[in-house]
């Protein structure tokens, strides 16, 4: 279920004021049809991203709900960068996250992505316990990017430890968002097919702890070296993870990720936020044509 991040700044019609997210999704769907890659998923912001402010209006909610149903889209919202329930401001933050979850349910958005912190699993679990759950909406914990912290959640061992604690705490509706650029930045080599395969086989070995029905992906190349700790996305086969495989794409680690995503029907989002809509659509056209060749 491949798709992309839909920024209303880059996707909505000029002059749009009240239904910009729904309008962006309409243009995004039309673009997918134009490049002959019908999108199955999308990611949006309904709040923030840098402030704790809901930015979807009532009229937009109604139109977005219709758009999601009409095109049978799997849509996830990305939480704001302040959505850190294990922080010192957790009382305000957890209330705000609950508001985001309620909006997600109202319009048919399947989940909310939160950035994992580089903190101990027990602190993350305690933070999650403070969030009032909303039925049918999954909180996806996104693998972070860091270099020096003990808890990077880029290794299968640490992911397993965290989700065992989540399961033992009887928390429901908690999933995992694997960002390929982040785990690379945290020191996991997923460049070649065998390298990525080893990591993904280890992930399959803990499906009893975190099932694929609760796993999604941010499918990004990276503009920095493995283990840099820096989060800088690049287009597929244009960054330092997979560029060396651009002429032998089925030997790349990306192909192994595509196989896993297809085998388990996981949503996968390309996160691109370039300077103009033309630049963005040009880059995405190339990337989705490449994905189409990997799916053959």
Swiss-Prot record:
GO terms for biological process: base-excision repair. Coiled coil: none annotated. Binds 3 Zn(2+) ions. GO terms for cellular component: host cell cytoplasm; host cell nucleus; virion component. InterPro entries: AP_endonuc_2, AP_endonuc_F2_Zn_BS, Xyl_isomerase-like_sf, Xyl_isomerase-like_TIM-brl. The keyword Metal-binding applies. Endonuclease of the viral base excision repair system that catalyzes DNA cleavage reaction at the apurinic or apyrimidinic sites (AP sites). Cleaves phosphodiester bonds on the 5' side of AP sites. In addition to endonuclease activity, the AP endonuclease has a proofreading 3'-5' exonuclease activity that is considerably more efficient in the elimination of a mismatch than in that of a correctly paired base. Displays 3'-phosphatase and 3'-repair diesterase activities. The single nucleotide gaps generated by the AP endonuclease are filled by the viral repair DNA polymerase X and the DNA ligase. Zn(2+) 2 binds at residues 115, 142, 218. Disulfide bonds join 16-20. SMART domains: AP2Ec (SM00518). It is found in: Host nucleus; Host cytoplasm; Virion. It is an enzyme of class 3 (hydrolase). Zn(2+) 1 binds at residues 78, 271. Belongs to the AP endonuclease 2 family. Keywords: Disulfide bond, DNA damage, DNA repair, Early protein, Endonuclease, Exonuclease, Host cytoplasm, Host nucleus, Hydrolase, Metal-binding, Nuclease, Virion, Zinc. This is Probable AP endonuclease. Induction: Expressed in the early phase of the viral replicative cycle and accumulates at later times. The keyword Zinc applies. Its EC number is 3.1.21.-. Its cofactor is Zn(2+). Pfam families: AP_endonuc_2. Consistent with its intracellular location, ASFV encodes its own replicative DNA polymerase and three base excision repair enzymes: a class II AP endonuclease, the repair polymerase Pol X, and an ATP-dependent DNA ligase. Zn(2+) 3 binds at residues 182, 231, 233.
């Amino acid at each position: 279920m491949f798709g992309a991040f839909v920024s209303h700044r880059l996707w909505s019609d000029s002059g749009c004021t009240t239904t910009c997210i729904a309008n962006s999704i309409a243009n995004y769907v039309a673009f997918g049809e134009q490049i002959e890659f019908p999108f199955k998923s999308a990611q949006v912001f309904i709040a923030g991203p840098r402030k704790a402010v809901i930015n979807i209006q009532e009229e937009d909610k109604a139109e977005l709900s219709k758009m999601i149903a009409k095109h049978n889209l799997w849509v996830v919202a990305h939480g704001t960068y302040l959505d850190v329930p294990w922080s010192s401001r957790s009382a305000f933050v957890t209330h705000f996250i609950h508001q985001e979850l309620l909006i997600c349910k109202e319009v048919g958005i399947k989940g909310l992505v939160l950035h994992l912190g580089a903190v101990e699993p027990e602190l993350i679990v305690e933070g999650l316990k403070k969030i009032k759950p909303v039925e049918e909406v999954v909180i996806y914990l996104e693998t972070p990017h860091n270099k020096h912290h003990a808890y990077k959640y880029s290794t299968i061992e640490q992911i397993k430890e965290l989700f065992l604690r989540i399961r033992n705490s009887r928390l429901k509706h908690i999933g995992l968002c694997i960002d390929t650029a982040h785990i690379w930045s945290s020191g996991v080599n997923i460049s070649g097919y065998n390298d990525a395969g080893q990591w993904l086989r280890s992930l399959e070995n803990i499906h009893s702890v975190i099932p694929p029905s609760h796993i999604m992906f941010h499918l990004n190349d990276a503009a920095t070296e493995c283990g840099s700790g820096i989060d800088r996305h690049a287009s597929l086969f244009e960054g330092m993870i997979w560029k060396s495989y651009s002429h032998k794409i089925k030997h790349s680690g990306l192909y192994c990720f595509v196989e896993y995503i297809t085998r388990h029907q996981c949503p996968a989002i390309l996160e691109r936020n370039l300077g103009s809509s033309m630049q963005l659509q040009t880059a995405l056209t190339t990337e989705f044509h490449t994905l189409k060749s990997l799916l053959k």
